[in-house]
Regions:
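Phosphate-coordination/substrate-recognition cap region in phosphate-metabolizing enzymes
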Residues: 1-60
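Short, flexible active-site-adjacent loop segments at beta-strand->alpha-helix junctions, enriched
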Residues: 14, 40, 68-70, 90, ...
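Residue-level signal for well-ordered alpha-helical positions
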Residues: 22-23, 77-78, 97
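Non-DNA-binding regulatory cores of transcription-related proteins
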Residues: 55-58, 63, 68-90
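Domain-level recognition of soluble alpha/beta enzyme cores
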Residues: 81-117
């Protein structure tokens, strides 16, 4: 898999929760590792970045499931290859050299992957 995770944080929206359940099943993650977070029921880049800063440092790999335009903006913030839109059911993965989630807003990722078709 391109994605690995210890925990899935998801918006409380029905479609986001359903996506999280499918993702957990696909990645063999126990459903108890899905955490519903009302803070992720937002379309704001700033609010999602603030949530990321509060992730417990016991986790080194997390998945966030949420909403646009916030996730498109986060992808563009960390990637040199800008996109117009992160479509439904698409993802991007970031890797950082840090053990502290509160630091990543100021860091450049050491890798960036996505499952977007070219030209999106």
């Amino acid at each position: 898999h391109f994605i690995s995770s210890e925990i899935i944080y998801t918006s409380s929206a029905n479609r986001a929760l359903y996506t999280s359940i499918l993702l957990a099943k696909s990645l063999s993650i126990n459903f108890s590792k899905i955490k519903i977070c009302d803070e992720l029921y937002t379309f704001s880049f700033t609010e999602v970045m603030e949530f990321i800063r509060t992730i417990d440092n016991i986790y080194s790999n997390v998945v966030l499931v949420g909403h646009n335009p916030a996730y498109t903006e986060i992808s563009n913030y960390f990637s040199e290859n800008k996109i117009l839109n992160l479509p439904t059911a698409r993802w991007f993965s970031l890797k950082f050299e840090s053990d502290n989630w509160s630091d990543i807003i100021d860091l450049k990722p050491i890798s960036y992957l996505n499952n977007l078709k070219s030209g999106v």
